[in-house]
Curated annotation (Swiss-Prot):
One term of GO molecular function: argininosuccinate lyase activity
Protein name, per record: Argininosuccinate lyase
Gene from which the chain derives: argH
HAMAP family linked to this entry: Arg_succ_lyase (MF_00006)
CDD domains: Argininosuccinate_lyase (cd01359)
């Protein structure tokens, strides 16, 4: 007999039990469910809704059940539907009618809202730790490559010289925003819904603030109808994780490009590469490719959540059971990707000579050549046109700009002097860009210092 079966004259069909049950995936919330029930039982006793003796017995038995689950001594039942009913059924089997008092003043609607909030806030903390580890790795790579020059790209065409440190710190900023988004999302997750009942609260004199304090929530929900039907926090976290994966995917794409012979900027460690079943020479960046591929999976989880919640009337609907597999999958995927990605970039070999050689080609100093003329008094648009013609001349004559002799320079502008060679050297092109946020050494070091300060607060 179901715990809710009093109104029914027959048992549910086995196919309905199988279809309706969520225990196979929501069982992972057993700890949060039991901790929430312990706090609820403690509050029921303190508020004299049940006796103190019964409250203590329920709490102690729930702790025993938690220990037994963690030791693998408990087998959940499909016909008990979900983690909430499974735990309650086990409780009743151990202490009889006293266990039946636990659900006083509570519905599964506010109970599941509590469990998922407690579960997700724990996961946010774990993901944030993984991100901080990634950020520290990026800073170490940046420190070791302050003077490593490579071309910066636009449209995947060589554009201007930067440093590898500057490039790594660009990704640091992306993941910093991810941490900030998670921190902000955490605020809306960490709101306590218990006491909202099925939808209209309860007539019992519950102390919601006590339960919130016991469970470490910052505040309580302010509308019972909203509290049991709200999954914004789930969708918001899914969106945060989707953006995070987008950043990992962009980084992965560059890793894949850089590891190719066409770029040759890095070599991935053997431990983070794979081979081919037919081509003996292959060393494939499978980790980066799989991270890139799993990004679409996390996007799909977000779209699934949005689709489930679309058009649902207030308050709780069974559709909302579908929220868990999507958010669990997104969380699991991110937690799987971050550690292996961090180790992959931590162990990769930086080919500084190849990076410099690439920066020396492709006229990456052309903008600085135009700026040189501007500093001599030529309007920028005129300088832009002059240097465009100079680049065309260099292409036709198979020369780099810095390889032109003075007579060739003078053919484009009489204002060009011997100092041009120093001004358009790659090192000067980089060091001259010393504004805050620029690629110059002092600018990147300041960015690293700011990054370390940020991480110290996480």
């Amino acid at each position: 007999m179901k715990l809710w079966g009093g109104r029914f004259e027959k048992n549910t069909d086995k196919s309905v039990d199988d279809f309706n049950s969520s225990i196979r995936f929501d069982c992972r919330m057993y700890k949060q469910d039991i901790l929430g029930s312990i706090a609820h039982a403690k509050m029921l006793g303190k508020c004299k809704i049940i006796s103190e003796e019964d409250s203590i017995l329920i709490q102690n038995t729930l702790r025993e059940i938690l220990k037994d689950i963690e030791e693998g001594k408990v087998q959940f039942e499909i016909d008990a539907e979900d983690i909430h009913m499974n735990v309650e059924k086990i409780l009743i089997s151990r202490i009889g009618d006293v266990g039946k008092k636990l659900h006083t003043g509570r519905s599964r609607n506010d109970q599941v809202a509590l469990d998922i909030r407690m579960y997700l806030r724990d996961e946010v903390v774990e993901i944030r730790k993984l991100l901080v580890n990634l950020e520290r790795t990026l800073i170490e790579i940046a420190k070791n490559n302050i003077d490593t020059i490579l071309p910066g790209y636009t449209h995947l065409q060589r554009a201007q010289p930067i440093t590898f440190a500057h490039h790594m710190m660009a990704y640091f900023q992306m993941f910093k925003r991810d941490i900030e988004r998670l921190n902000d999302c955490y605020k809306r997750i960490n709101v306590m819904p218990l006491g909202s009942g099925a939808l209209a609260s309860t007539t019992y004199p519950l102390d919601r603030y006590m339960v919130a304090k016991e469970l470490g929530f910052d505040s309580i929900t302010e509308n019972s109808l909203d509290a049991v039907s709200d999954r914004d926090f789930v969708i918001e976290l899914s969106a945060c994780l989707s953006i995070l994966m987008m950043h990992l995917s962009r980084f992965s794409e560059e890793i894949i490009l850089w590891a190719s012979h066409e770029f040759g900027f890095i070599e991935l460690d053997d431990a983070y590469s794979t081979g081919s079943s037919i081509m003996p020479q292959k060393k494939n960046p499978d980790v980066a490719e799989l991270v890139r591929g799993k990004t679409g999976r996390v996007y799909g989880d977000l779209m699934a959540l949005l689709s489930v919640m679309k058009s649902l009337p207030l308050a709780y609907n069974k559709d909302m059971q579908e929220d868990k597999e999507a958010i669990f999958d997104a969380v699991d995927t991110v937690k799987m990707c971050l550690p292996v990605f961090t180790k992959m970039i931590e162990t990769m070999k930086i080919k500084k000579e190849n990076m410099l050689r690439a920066a020396q080609g492709g006229f990456t100093n052309a903008t600085d050549m135009a700026d040189y003329l501007v500093k001599k008094g030529i309007p920028f648009r005129n300088a832009h046109e002059i240097i465009g013609k100079m680049v065309l001349y260099c292409i036709e004559n198979n020369k780099a700009i810095e390889e032109l002799d003075m007579s060739e320079f003078k053919s484009f502008s009489e204002l060009i002097e011997e100092d041009v060679y120093e001004e358009i050297s790659l090192s000067k092109c980089v060091s001259g860009r010393n504004l805050p946020g620029g690629p110059a050494k002092e600018s990147v070091m300041a960015s690293i210092e700011n990054g370390l300060k940020f991480l110290s607060t996480q």
